Amino acid sequence: MKFLMISSNFFSIFATSNCNLMKKFLFFLTALLCVSLAEAKVSLPQLFQSGMVLQRGKTIPIWGKADAGETVTVTLNKKQYTTVADEHGRWRVDLPKMKAGGPFTMEVKGEEAKSEKLVIDNVLIGDVWLLSGQSNIDVTIERVYPQYTQEIDTYENPQIRLFRVQNSTSTHGVKDDILPTSINWKPVTKQNAWLFSAAGYFLGKRMFEKTNVPQGIIVNSWGGTPIEAWISADSLQRDYPMLVKRTAFYQNDEYVKAQMKANAEANKQWDALLNEADATQDYIRLDYDDTNWQTINQNNWTWRGTGTVWLRQHININKEHARKAARLLLGTLFDQDVTYLNGQEIGHTYYQYPPRRYDIPEGLLREGDNVISVRFINKYGAAHFIPEKPYMLCFGDDRLSQNPMPKDVIPLADTWKMHIGVEMPSCPSGDVSLQNLPTTLYNAVLYPLAPYALNGVVWYQGESNTGNPAPYADYLKKLMGCWRDRWQDQQMPFVIVQLANYDGRQQTGMPRPITYQADPVNSGWAQLREAQRTAAKADPYAELAVINDLGETVDIHPLRKKEVAERVGLCFDRLVFNDKKVSLAPEIISSEVQDGKVVLTIDQPVLAGTLYEFEIAGEDGKFVNAEANADGNRITILSPLASDFSPQKVRYAWKDNPVKANVRSLSGLPMSSFEMVINRK
């Protein structure tokens, strides 16, 4: 610790000149000394908290800050490790490899007598996994609960710890630490996991069952973000300097604050005007006369305005169901809604994606006529119901489950009474969205995590890049490269979760009918899946988790996250634990022409039979559908054209939503979509 050195002559001169000045100076000196003492405290990053999991079998870095030159001692498992803070106050010790175990207590202390000792208890040694990406990592246990009700209700495991990185951005370069978070190494219980990543929860559970050692799950994701936000400036600068310049524009903090304030004020005023013009609450009353309202069918509703629109549906409840607790499933809606039953609000959702699951308290449903009133608030695009979702009242002890669906249900009708509340111009944007700018998330929430020892990384992202898939493979290569550089581990394992199947024509502001895409299309989702496939294939320390059968046609956030975690776990079984017995998704090895037929060789046997979603192209580059059959590890594709047709390329499952794709391994894993030039010997 550094002390202020002030001569006695200085004090005597100061005292004789002015007593009041002397008092002020002593006050200043005391304050300065307090600051000096405060700065002398040894500190640790936010990752280091009680309950944490440290990585087994690898060197364990522990780091933090102290006064420059101060000696810092770290004690773990009754062993001491000492280092000295550098000229910038940074210190680090590397603990030797440890076996799985615990709980242990870790103590960190400076050399000075007044230095506060930091005590971190309940520390486990096991496996630590980092999950990053966008909203499909964000999807919580709360969201998927109806898919796995019994499992989530009953499963607890203090050996699995959950850590959620708090969202933050930086346009001014890298940060030293992340922000404090409320989910800080919490043990797995239903309550602790409720707002935690479902993919992370199930990965921890799966890997614990595999290894029987403690599991630490760090989730670091942000919905809607592109991959560029997660890559370092140094990695982008050479090949994509304009991306770095785009972020530099937002380094003007005053501009950003002014823009955010203006947008927020415009949004606030829009809401105020909306509520002033549509202030009536009469429409929620059971006895309101809606006979003169227009009747619409939710499956072909044509209103295209923005503002508010009211919908009402009467439903008859028999004596058996009257006064019982229930759950209303109102599918998903575009965009916002406030929903009432018999004049009482039962739920609201302020954006389009979450499923509407509204619990009805006991006593609210009455025998006879009841009315559901929905106030749509639509700030842009066209208000609509998302098809293929459940719209019903659910009763009984299993009413919270959707896998299977409850036994006692009353389906809602497709028809509603409709009345326009108020029509408004589209609402202005309320967010500058710094999280979508290149480098901002790498700077703020990725860089500070290193060098915390990890066993592997899950990258589950891509939806926000489907509009421009061409550079994605290179972006992904740069992301894996700069993260490995940051951890100084060029063999850091990555599992890339490929995009699921999805048809986005309904989850947009201008919905279009969902019909099967029978003809070949130039799919942005397929192109991005191909970028993920080729990037993973080119990297010896990466694997691809194929999930093109786990999506939902009308939902960009499919619920089957346990199955996603299982496939990620299989990849880690091979990549990290070197389990040679594990079979992953079938992978295309080669393609060639034999006797006028295109023959594909796969890395393993696949289920035999007729196959779908194959296309071939001739010299003109135009793809056409083709029949295919599987036998062992070979797929034979028959040309649908004339005998002189010369196939040049073949591709598979080349659609946003390739619902008929059916190439599977003998264990049931689906093959990735691909496009390949045919080898012509």
PLM segments and residue spans:
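Ser/Thr-rich low-complexity repeats and stalk/linker segments
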Residues: 41, 49-124, 382
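Surface beta-strand/loop "capping" patches
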Residues: 46, 55-58, 303-307, 327, ...
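Aromatic-lined ligand-binding clefts that engage carbohydrates, nucleic acids, or primary amines
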Residues: 63, 293, 315-343, 372-374
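Beta-strand-rich ligand-recognition modules
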Residues: 78-101, 332, 339-392
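C-terminal beta-sandwich/jelly-roll accessory domains of carbohydrate-active enzymes
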Residues: 80, 603-681
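Short, aromatic- and glycine-rich surface loops/edge beta-strands on solvent-exposed regions
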Residues: 102-111, 373-374, 647-654
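Short acidic/polar inter-strand loop motif in beta-rich domains
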Residues: 111-118, 377-384, 654-663
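An acidic-aromatic loop/edge-strand motif
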Residues: 118-187, 218-300, 369-443, 447-452
